[in-house]
Amino acid sequence: MKEKLKELQELAIKQIENSIKSNELEEIRVKFLGKKGELTTILRGMGGLSPEERPLVGKLVNEAKAKVEEKLESAIKKIKDKEKAEKLAGETIDISLPGKKQVIGKSHPLELTLKNMEDIFVSMGFTIEEGPEVEYDHYNFEALNIPKNHPARSEQDTLYINDNIVLRTQTSPVQVRTMENQKPPIKMISPGKVYRSDSVDATHSPIFYQMEGLVIDKGVTFADLKGTLELFAKKMFGDKVETKFRPHHFPFTEPSAEMDATCFVCGGEGCRVCKNSGWIELLGCGMVHPNVLRNCGIDPEVYSGFAFGFGVDRMVMLKYGIDDIRLLYESDMRFLNQF
């Protein structure tokens, strides 16, 4: 029995030493140490031995198993280390290879236009002011001379949080807050998002961008308003652009007007974009209503001022010839990569 155990032990160790793959070692383990393995079978057959032989044979079998297991574990570790090293060698990075080209982002046409407009007004001495998009009724309507029964207050046009709080429908509340917190002279613009209860179509969106401007000082006239906006139009669209002012009505300015510019597409000749009129509406403007000045603690007998407002999305569409406002908000890279 002792000789047989020695032969099995030597055979197992020899096969282990000759193995070069993990699956080969697993086969050896099953062959000698598994439930039906040769060394395990000897242990199970000890019932047929005499009481005197059992302790000796049991000791010899366990010693043989221990040596085979030790050799097996060592071989398994060695093969795994080798396989790992080979895998790592195959995955080595060639640092001489060129790297992947990074995709460079681009500015959105809305951002480009806003930045362009801001730069023009800042160069003219305007400051940029900001305010909350969730606004009190007082700042959005009351302080701007928009009475309780005004159509702009209806739920068809305005998104209400509650009776006293709305999503601002214009950036004019920033002008009110600025007049409350700063003493004249004031020369500011207020770009930002505004909200209306509109259905989405080619020319309407419930969220869009506005830029409004305000100038308050002693002796400010409508001529100052015209000169400021005409200069802006030339800087924005080129020296050849012409402008004209039409009478209009806004509750927060008096007198009020709308400014048109010669069509950027046809140069005033008439086309589909300008509906063959040669002119495109750019903005609303006017002299600040005395009631608005009083509401903000400014004496209209001493100070006067003018205000104006652009739809920035509209400016983008006019400047780049875009005929659907939805393109500005759909994040379609085929569209955005054109800018």
Swiss-Prot record:
Q: Does the keyword Protein biosynthesis apply?
A: yes
Q: Where in the cell is it found?
A: Cytoplasm
Q: Alphabetically list the UniProt keywords.
A: Aminoacyl-tRNA synthetase, ATP-binding, Cytoplasm, Ligase, Magnesium, Metal-binding, Nucleotide-binding, Protein biosynthesis
Query: Can you quote the record's cofactor note?
Result: Binds 2 magnesium ions per tetramer.
Q: Residue span of the signal peptide, if any?
A: none
Instruction: Output the Pfam families linked to this UniProt entry.
Output: Phe_tRNA-synt_N, tRNA-synt_2d
Gene Ontology terms for molecular function: ATP binding; catalytic activity, acting on a protein; magnesium ion binding; phenylalanine-tRNA ligase activity; transferase activity; tRNA binding
Query: An example Gene Ontology cellular component term from the record?
Result: cytoplasm
Q: Which GO terms describe its biological process?
A: phenylalanyl-tRNA aminoacylation
Q: Which residues bind Mg(2+)?
A: E254
List, alphabetically, the InterPro entries matched.
aa-tRNA-synth_II, aa-tRNA-synth_II/BPL/LPL, Phe-tRNA-synth_IIc_asu, Phe-tRNA_ligase_II_N, Phe_tRNA_ligase_alpha1_bac, Phenylalanyl-tRNA_Synthase, tRNA-bd_arm
What class does this enzyme belong to in the EC scheme?
ligase
E.C. code: 6.1.1.20
* Binding partners and assembly: Tetramer of two alpha and two beta subunits.
Q: Which PANTHER family match?
A: PHENYLALANINE--TRNA LIGASE, MITOCHONDRIAL, PHENYLALANYL-TRNA SYNTHETASE
What protein family is recorded?
Belongs to the class-II aminoacyl-tRNA synthetase family. Phe-tRNA synthetase alpha subunit type 1 subfamily.
Q: What is this protein called?
A: Phenylalanine--tRNA ligase alpha subunit
Origin organism is Clostridium botulinum (strain Eklund 17B / Type B)
